[in-house]
Amino acid sequence: GTRVAIYGDPEMVLGMLSLSLENGMYPVLVAPSCKTPAFREHAQERIDAMNLDCDVKIFEGLDFDAFNDAVKDAEPEILMGNSNGKYISQQMGVPLIRVGFPIHDRVGAQRILTMGYRGAMSMIDRITNTILEAKDIELEKKWLQNKSNDLQGSCCDRRSAHMQPH
């Protein structure tokens, strides 16, 4: 499964935690923006019910510097949360699925449906498309690197052939 870090408002984080667990993802980091009395208990119940093979770290009320460090340690493949995580996403080269509040760097974010059946299906589509895009980018980079190596090798082979005494 895909390793995901989820952060934001506690209610949204619990919802995205459930959605990701139910769809075979590994939530390696769960970070609600503030401490609430029952968050850890509710999150742990959901995690325990899935019998995961990975360690899930729950950090409540982290500032973004501490969150940044926690994300680096957890090594997720995807981030799920608000726009405030875009710099971490860019630094680490990890895709960000924007969900929750605030989303201030996208037009129409206030109309993104996340509640109910239609919202869950929409989120699953967004998650899946993000995973597919990340895999596409990874494969394209490998292909370009191989092409570059092939071109350098053939160029060097030709150059060395011309430099040989006849």
Please place each PLM-identified region on the residue numbering.
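An N-terminal assembly and electron-transfer interface module characteristic of large anaerobic redox
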Residues: 1-166
